[in-house]
Every structure is written in structure tokens, then in C-alpha cells.
Amino acid sequence: MRASRGFTLIELMVVMVIISVLIGLAVLSTGFASTSRELDSEAERLAGLIGVLTDEAVLDNREYGLRLERDAYQVLRYDEAKARWLPVARDSHRLPEWAELTFELDGQPLVLAGSKGEKEQKKGTDQPQLLILSSGELSPFRLRLAERGPEGRALSLSSDGFRLPRVEVARR
């Protein structure tokens, strides 16, 4: 009887095919769906933030607001002693470079500032577009979070002023 000393060519080819298929699946699963998943995550994060701010506004009897830009948003709170809006955190939350926000207040589209240069020009107008009141009410709004470009996916958050926003797939 003859002892076998190694693998046959067929066995090596089968292993190579299996490894190739697994690498291909790994590349596909991380490459194409990552922006879609990240968009979902950003929309859920924003909806959750609005929900938490609504609860905090009622519990602390304090007014909150969201200052929106095309590529970022920032939480503000109203300081009654100073009679102005102050940022809760030092920096605003930046969206990924492939994402952008659009905003409608009471059915009217608002033009959002886009870059830091535009923001610095309007430094005195640090008013929030979305109000979260201590009564538990919100400004009636529709916010659209989308991938830039004509084929990009878009998600929508909206509220009639009394209900918390839900994330929905937006129509292009």
C-alpha cells in the first residue's frame, strides 16, 4: 500500500474556491450596505435624541431646541436668566460627508446653513429651528436625512407637534 504525501490538485482547487467565495461575501456585505446602515443609525439616533429631549423638557420644566444645518445638528437649551439659547454640548453632531439634512417647519421648507463659514456669518442668529417645549409639545416638522446624489436613499422623521417622530423611508 502506498502512503499519500500531500493534497491532490482537486482538493487545493476546492479550498481556493471556498476561500474566494467567503472573501467576496465579506467585501460585499461591508461595502455596499454600510452607508444604508449608517443612515438608519443616524436617523434612529436623531429620533431617539428628540424623544429624550422631550422627556427631559417635561421633567426639568426646561425648553430645548435643535439647531439644524445641512450637515450637522446641535442641542440648545433656553436660559431664562440670560434670555437666550445656549448650547448643551460644546460641539454639534456632524453627519457623515455623504449625508445631508433638509427641514420643513409647519409644512414650509427652511433653508439650512451648510458650512462653518455660513454659520460664523450668522453668529448672532443661534436660534433653534425645532423647539421642544416643557409642556411636551414639539414644533410640527418634517426632517429628511438623505444620502447626497440622485440615487441616494432617504429617511424621514416627522411629528405633528404632539407625537414623537418615527423614522420612515422617504420618497425621492
Swiss-Prot record:
It comes from Pseudomonas aeruginosa (strain ATCC 15692 / DSM 22644 / CIP 104116 / JCM 14847 / LMG 12228 / 1C / PRS 101 / PAO1). The keyword Protein transport applies. The gene is xcpU. Residues 1-6 form a propeptide. The modification N-methylphenylalanine is found at F7. It is found in: Cell inner membrane. One of its GO terms (biological process) is single-species biofilm formation. Type II secretion is composed of four main components: the outer membrane complex, the inner membrane complex, the cytoplasmic secretion ATPase and the periplasm-spanning pseudopilus. Forms the tip of the type II pseudopilus by interacting with XcpV, XcpW and XcpX. Interacts with core component XcpT. Component of the type II secretion system required for the energy-dependent secretion of extracellular factors such as proteases and toxins from the periplasm. Part of the pseudopilus tip complex that is critical for the recognition and binding of secretion substrates. Type II pseudopilus confers increased bacterial adhesive capabilities. It comes from the Bacteria. The keyword Amino-acid biosynthesis does not apply. GO terms for cellular component: plasma membrane; type II protein secretion system complex. Keywords: Cell inner membrane, Cell membrane, Membrane, Methylation, Protein transport, Transmembrane, Transmembrane helix, Transport. Its main location: membrane. This is Type II secretion system protein H.
